[in-house]
Design a protein with these regions (language model features):
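Ferredoxin-type iron-sulfur electron-transfer modules and their immediate structural context
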Residues: 1-76, 121, 128
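Iron-sulfur-cluster electron-transfer modules
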Residues: 29, 35-40, 66-165
Length: 165
């Protein structure tokens, strides 16, 4: 079975909803139902969210970005490695590679992950490419990659339960 054929088809614009509808679809006749099961990992994967026993990897909708983003919640992770084992990307390690939400200054200091920590309602301490800065994610000129800024803003605005109080 040529999974790349199905993945390429699924990655065409406007197919994300179709991919999500297929998630969890079971079929015993693998020869005849591949096209109804393949999500196309390049368009919808999120397997790291499904296999994490602690739900430390969370897929969120980010206004302004085409695809859901996976945020890794450091305080919920026990580094079991499930997400790395099941990641379809070669050498993928979502618990290390995904933007990480930290719950404490100490956790952020003890990690090498790129990520962010809420300082107050408007400001976040952010580490990207080894540089740490405190920014307001409402400001457009933060110096952060736009996808990072928008992801942090989405967590604050739409997923505040992820931020430890």
């Amino acid at each position: 079975v040529d999974f790349n054929k199905y993945a390429d088809c699924n990655e065409q614009a406007g197919r994300e909803d179709t991919c999500y509808e297929r998630k969890g679809s079971l079929c015993r006749d693998k020869r005849n139902c591949t096209k109804t099961r393949c999500l196309g990992c390049g368009s919808v994967c999120e397997v790291c969210c499904d296999v994490c026993p602690n739900r430390a990897n969370v897929a969120i909708k980010v206004p302004g970005l085409a695809k859901h983003q996976v945020v890794h919640v450091d305080g919920m992770c026990n580094e079991c490695g499930n997400c790395a084992v099941f990641c379809p990307y070669q050498e993928g390690r979502p618990y290390k590679d995904k933007l990480t939400l930290f719950w404490s200054e100490q956790d952020m200091e003890n990690s090498e992950n790129e990520g962010f920590l809420a300082v107050d309602e408007d400001h976040f301490k952010v580490r990207v490419a080894g540089t740490v800065r405190t920014v307001s994610v409402d400001a457009v000129n933060t110096g952060l990659p736009e996808a990072v800024r928008l992801t942090i803003k989405a967590v604050r605005d739409n997923y505040p339960y992820l931020l430890k109080k």
